[in-house]
């Protein structure tokens, strides 16, 4: 980005650990204001939206959106510790061990954030902790349907539409729910949990 540490006005960061401890430790020696984000699978998007709002409002010139995840910590946090040795059903997610960061600032260069629609809780009563894709699919479908209505756009206006980690079962339900509203996403959508 060509920026120095002191060019960043605020960092929005999160991970899949209690108290955003991974993010806190990684930023503890930096002299940058830090706002912890905890949205599980939506942490990166949540961080990007907040960073964009800060920059657009003038509260920051540059804001960082950061997230990280670790397979073993996600297993411990959301399912069973690996030491427990439980069997994984086919609907279980496989959390990536990964990290990513974006710097948000005003400018004309693409890519840029033009729209954001924050989702709401849509609970269809899924109780299986090993089928988080089906638990998340209703909110993902509702958010995307709202986004198309809010922006007066259709799937064909986009090169690709990605969801985070619905997996196979969640993606099938996601398609079923969007198709009920007359929206066919099959040619424009990919789920990162299926890549």
Model-inferred region functions:
Residues 1-9, 143-157:
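Phosphate/pyrophosphate-binding loops at sites that engage ATP/ADP/AMP, CoA/4′-phosphopantetheine
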Residues 20-24, 72-73, 115-118:
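Short hydrophobic/aromatic-rich motifs at helix boundaries and adjacent loops
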Residues 19, 70-77, 123-128, 168:
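Short, mixed-charge aromatic SLiMs
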Residues 1, 44-48, 137-145:
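Short, hydrophobic/amphipathic alpha-helical packing segments
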Residues 26-33, 52, 56, 72-94:
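Cofactor- and metal-binding active-site motifs of prokaryotic enzymes
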Residues 59, 97, 155-157:
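Short, well-ordered loop/turn elements at secondary-structure boundaries
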Residues 9-10, 14-18, 23-62, 69, ...:
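Claisen-condensing/thiolase-fold acyl-transfer catalytic domains that form or cleave C-C bonds
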Residues 81-145, 150-153, 187-195:
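Condensing-enzyme catalytic core mediating Claisen C-C bond formation in acyl metabolism
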């Amino acid at each position: 980005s060509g920026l120095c540490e002191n060019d960043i006005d605020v960092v929005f960061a999160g991970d899949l650990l209690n108290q955003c401890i991974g993010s806190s430790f990684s930023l503890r020696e930096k002299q940058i204001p830090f706002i912890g984000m905890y949205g599980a699978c939506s942490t990166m998007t949540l961080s990007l939206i907040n960073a964009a709002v800060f920059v657009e409002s003038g509260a920051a010139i540059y804001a960082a959106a950061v997230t990280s995840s670790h397979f073993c910590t996600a297993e411990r946090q959301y399912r069973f510790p690996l030491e427990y040795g439980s069997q994984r059903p086919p609907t279980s997610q496989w959390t990536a061990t990964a990290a990513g960061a974006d710097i948000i600032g005003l400018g004309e260069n693409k890519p840029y954030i033009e729209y954001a629609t924050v989702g709401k809780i849509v609970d269809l009563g899924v109780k299986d902790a090993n089928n988080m894709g089906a638990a998340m699919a209703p909110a993902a479908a509702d958010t995307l349907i709202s986004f198309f209505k809010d922006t007066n756009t259709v799937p064909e206006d986009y090169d690709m539409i990605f969801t985070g980690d619905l997996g196979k079962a969640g993606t099938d339900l996601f398609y079923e729910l969007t198709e009920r509203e007359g929206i066919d996403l099959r040619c424009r959508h990919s789920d990162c949990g299926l890549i």
